[in-house]
Amino acid sequence: MSKFSYLQNGKASTNGVPHANGHHQQHQNGHSNGVARNGGTATDTLPVAYQQKAATSGPFHMPRTEHVGYTYDTLQEIATYLLERTELRPKVGIICGSGLGTLAEQLTDVDSFDYETIPHFPVSTVAGHVGRLVFGYLAGVPVMCMQGRFHHYEGYPLAKCAMPVRVMHLIGCTHLIATNAAGGANPKYRVGDIMLIKDHINLMGFAGNNPLQGPNDERFGPRFFGMANTYDPKLNQQAKVIARQIGIENELREGVYTCLGGPNFETVAEVKMLSMLGVDAIGMSTVHEIITARHCGMTCFAFSLITNMCTMSYEEEEEHCHDSIVGVGKNREKTLGEFVSRIVKHIHYEAKK
């Protein structure tokens, strides 16, 4: 039997194994003008809804998969649930990375919601991620803060990992500040450095894994859109000014970030390859959140706290672990709190002009 999937006796199979998701993959070498190998049409064995879709749009325009994310109505329901329970109307959303959740603890006059109490919300399972959505004031500015995010390695599709960004958008946030803990792939970096993200390489997207896969809802944004200057250059420039003001300019970097699937750390060969591609920091988050935010038209600012140096030689002893990563974040909480507070203040000031 061919290694490619085709319809046989009404079932899609690959090497004799039915597809677990129940959807049928189609290939031109198995069909001619929409005719299946068994003599019927390519749509005969599909669910009725798919057959109806094919009848109006043709056999080669049938949905490939169901959307793995949330519908607009479901996300609107989440946003409404939250807005009915807080008087705050934030314009800035913040995502706290591993060990950086204490940023949310600097908010005042808070309304907080555990993820498990919010309808349709996933639950964070990683140490260092509290799993709480917090509304409050940071430097006198209303914000909403994710105290813990969702990762692909927890078993969530990327669309679900990035779902809270769309909720932020529906609540009224125009800006996203994303933070993460990352490994330094640039040998000039040091543990404790803050790297402003000027660009990213979407490696998971190279493999066809994107948070926007599936049907597009124009109410969020267009099907196709550009990603140049995704990380707002003006905010990055202002961040450098702020770093000088609070005396951390020597610890501030600017570079390229990439996201791997995790949960394992990178091999030496992988780090060498990514360094050759121009990657300065490696993590397991952020990229899909930023893509989703840009799709919604949000302005993005992001930075990585370098919590470990990637292992770049087989002679090195691999010392980094998740506990030490969380520890670095806690050691830098005061500095990062001041840094983010001033960024938020600047965003608020610029919006009032």
Swiss-Prot record:
The keyword Signal does not apply. It comes from the Eukaryota. It is an enzyme of class 2 (transferase). One of its GO terms (cellular component) is cytoplasm. Pathway: Purine metabolism; purine nucleoside salvage. Phosphate binds at S98, H129, R149, F150, H151, A181, S285. It catalyses: inosine + phosphate = alpha-D-ribose 1-phosphate + hypoxanthine; guanosine + phosphate = alpha-D-ribose 1-phosphate + guanine; 2'-deoxyguanosine + phosphate = 2-deoxy-alpha-D-ribose 1-phosphate + guanine; 2'-deoxyinosine + phosphate = 2-deoxy-alpha-D-ribose 1-phosphate + hypoxanthine. Signal peptide: none annotated. The keyword Signal does not apply. GO terms for molecular function: purine-nucleoside phosphorylase activity. It holds the Pfam family PNP_UDP_1. A purine D-ribonucleoside binds at E266, N308. Inhibited by 5'-deaza-1'-aza-2c-deoxy-1'-(9-methylene) immucillin-H (DADMe-ImmH). InterPro entries: Nucleoside_phosphorylase_d (IPR000845), Nucleoside_phosphorylase_sf (IPR035994), Pur_Nuc_Pase_Ino/Guo-sp (IPR011270), Purine_phosphorylase (IPR011268). Homotrimer. As part of the purine salvage pathway, catalyzes the phosphorolytic breakdown of the N-glycosidic bond in the beta-(deoxy)ribonucleoside molecules, with the formation of the corresponding free purine bases and pentose-1-phosphate. Preferentially acts on 2'-deoxyinosine and inosine, and to a lesser extent on 2'-deoxyguanosine and guanosine. Has no activity towards adenosine or 2'-deoxyadenosine. Belongs to the PNP/MTAP phosphorylase family. This is Purine nucleoside phosphorylase.
